[in-house]
Amino acid sequence: MTQTLSQLEHHDAFIARHIGPSAPQQVHMLATVGSDSLAGLIAQIVPADIQLAAAPAVGEATTEAQALAELKAIARQNQRYKSFIGMGYSAVVTPPVILRNMLENPGWYTAYTPYQPEVSQGRLEALLNFQQLTLDLTGLDIASASLLDEATAAAEAMALAKRSSKLKQANCFFVADDVHPQTLDVLRTRAGTFGFELVIDKAQAALEHPDLFGVLLQQVGTTGELHDYRALMAELTRRKIISCVAADMLSLVLLAAPGEQGADVVFGSSQRFGVPMGYGGPHAAFFAARDEMKRAMPGRIIGVSRDAAGDTALRMVMQTREQHIRREKANSNICTSQVLLANIAGLYAVYHGPQGLKRIAGRIHRLTTILAQGLHDADLTLRHDRWFDTLTVEVVDKAGVLARANAAGINLRSDIHGAVGITLDETTVREDVQTLWQVVTGAAGTLAIDALDAGCDEVIPPELLRATPILTHEVFNRYHSETEMMRYMHRLERKDLALNQAMIPLGSCTMKLNAAAEMIPITWPEFAELHPFCPPEQAAGYQQMIAQLSRWLIQLTGYDALCMQPNSGAQGEYAGLLAIRRYHESRNQGERHICLIPSSAHGTNPASAQMAGMSVTVVACDKNGNIDLHDLRAKAEQAGEQLSCIMVTYPSTHGVYEETIREVCQIVHQYGGQVYLDGANMNAQVGITSPGYIGADVSHLNLHKTFCIPHGGGGPGMGPIGVKAHLAPFVPGHLVVELDGVLTRQGAVSAAPFGSASILPISWMYIRMMGAEGLKQASQVAILNANYIATRLQQAYPVLYTGRAGRVAHECILDIRPLKEATGISEMDIAKRLIDYGFHAPTMSFPVAGTLMVEPTESESQLELDRFIDAMLAIRAEIQQVADGVWPASDNPLVNAPYTQRELAGEWRHPYDRQIAAFPAGYGDKYWPAVKRLDDVYGDRNLFCACVPLSDY
């Protein structure tokens, strides 16, 4: 029969591009698991009382081309003014070699957090470059890589100061009043939940306030004044008060390092190192501190270690500080954040080198000084006499100045009483300075730039200029031609294993396809170039896209409202718990502070709860991995009027749909608590059920899991929160940007009003191309894929937890403990051996020690699933060889895995041959790790977190 035009138009073509198993493959897989249809399989697995009766109203699927055309039309509604607003955001030039070879390269943006260092040496080296950049510019001893944004880094600095303070009774944190307003906003929020007293005053008044544990200063104030805080910080040190300094990363190329001036903690945004403003993000924050604070620092730290062969290798160090291990006692709830952006910033420094960076910073500063002199000669008053790149100009007719600016297509900072602010940047040229002078003065003449340049004096005193060299390491002085830079980045990429080479079956991580069509819009200048504090009418396209995406997510979650501000899943948890706290306080029930958390929960949950000022009570799980309802009732009753909420993940972290989830919600509500449903496993809910329908009050969504934003090697992410109507007034708002009906008046949790807005087009594209039916199919196939793996592997590796009919949800936990007890082969050995088969390991020892948690997602075809299954079965056969005594327990292919090319070329002394070691899956498409198994203990005992000679790699 002839196909109809509608069929030939194939509007739902993308669904089959995104979902890995073809229709025939799905039939085969369903037969393998013993089901006759996807619908029948879901009916066996998902409790009937929570299944949706109707599809969410998110529209039908469309093609990649049509979705791109629709989004392009929306993007064109954004007006591309030149923004000289400053306030921590500046226009940049992203080097095309970095744009093409990193930001647009799936070998970089689809990788996961480098928990498996053997398959992550490339991005670990890039992150070490970022840390070295941070160390050189700040003048401090230890740096992390990296944090979410400058404002949240300020909050982390405040918390670090409290943890590190020797003044244990002190509870007051002082903040200079010329810190960026969005930073003040986030600090107020965080201080409130921590119970700190926050004092905001002139910096000179800091010493007048008693009971201080820390002080936050901004080296170049928000209105542009360059400060000399040396004497103040010396006195603070004498009084054992910790000095935290917010710094502009590019300014530090010219200015004296704050660490050399007495600062204990230095932080800021690395956005100016090649990362577009993107209407607020994503951008990586840098963070550095003194050596004695290292074990209290937030965020991931990359260190130099060695592998089993004694060769130099890199890894994340001091992981026992982090939320996935220390839970409510963690330094922070932050997981790896903004790695892709930190890598861009680090490679920007590698590409330009110290001389190139000095040229860029020097040009910006010189143009600023020329403009300042021109304005001074026009009898205008400048608020400050020392600056780097920002001027505050007093004007009589402010409205007239702003009108001329608007007519010229430029934005000035307008929130300063009686003045306008002007911040120059890397893109500023002579013509811009000319236009700015005309706009501010109202004069029609021209500015004699060369004459002013010849006559201008340096406004920065010598004692505030940098005297120590920066970026002397060879990595910053070698790759300045595009050819060399391209090859260096490719060498780093080849060391890593990302989704462009193999499935990454990490449980609880949802490493699904990040389609090219979804990624294309993030580099469109209409999205990339907007300042987050530009006039709202200039961001009409962003507002429409965000509003539409919010409506879709509300439909998919069953909630009434959505807040797009949290720029990570951890931030979403904090924001959701904060909404619960504010809600209770609004009802005069501020005593409700107990958060119930199942023992199976991810460590971020208790870490977020303590950050929100709550105390954690653990609820037991039964032998089947489900929440123990008897224990829940007892704990809820015991908490009584102090019960704030429960944090629960669904499907559970054990990989099953708990039949009693609605009863869990009812019990908590009965005692006056709220239900926080963690959205980590939303990929098994979309289109099938929803948190709101289940009975939850608030959830965060990991857009970097369920909705296709790539993991980027450890960020960026987005963690918007959906809430029921009664919590809607209590979600984060923003001090700087006021949008009635869109943003509340509550305090912020992130620097920008819509978090990392420039990556939201990825999720918009995914939902638009999939439509309601495609989204449901994605969830169904994710569940099918997990059950296919569980069915085929359960004889070799027991599946620890199953639900009804022996089924799992979208992930399964393989129990390695019996094998370890019998043979000594551990989950670690299996994880490392999988590298030789060309796979990234599943999640190790979470949520149960001695297990592997596997989540294949819907994007993997049967061919790739079979390749993984075959690898796991082959490894099981290898374990049997150890059990049978064919290979010694101390010298076999597993305990020595993985194998490098160097090792194969050397002397071979093992009781198995090289082919078994390095080519267990054959010779085709072989992935070679750059290093052997890491020596974790050595790396933590011999802490070294800066660049080593390139010859060591």
UniProtKB/Swiss-Prot annotation:
One of its GO terms (molecular function) is glycine binding. It is an enzyme of class 1 (oxidoreductase). InterPro entries: GcvP, GDC-P_C, GDC-P_N, GDC_P, PyrdxlP-dep_Trfase, PyrdxlP-dep_Trfase_major, PyrdxlP-dep_Trfase_small. One of its GO terms (cellular component) is cytosol. It comes from the Bacteria. It holds the Pfam family GDC-P. It catalyses: N(6)-[(R)-lipoyl]-L-lysyl-[glycine-cleavage complex H protein] + glycine + H(+) = N(6)-[(R)-S(8)-aminomethyldihydrolipoyl]-L-lysyl-[glycine-cleavage complex H protein] + CO2. Keywords: Oxidoreductase, Pyridoxal phosphate. Its cofactor is pyridoxal 5'-phosphate. The modification N6-(pyridoxal phosphate)lysine is found at residue 705. GO terms for biological process: glycine decarboxylation via glycine cleavage system. Its EC number is 1.4.4.2. The glycine cleavage system is composed of four proteins: P, T, L and H. NCBIfam families: gcvP (TIGR00461), PRK04366.1 (NF003346). The glycine cleavage system catalyzes the degradation of glycine. The P protein binds the alpha-amino group of glycine through its pyridoxal phosphate cofactor; CO(2) is released and the remaining methylamine moiety is then transferred to the lipoamide cofactor of the H protein. Belongs to the GcvP family. This is Glycine dehydrogenase (decarboxylating).
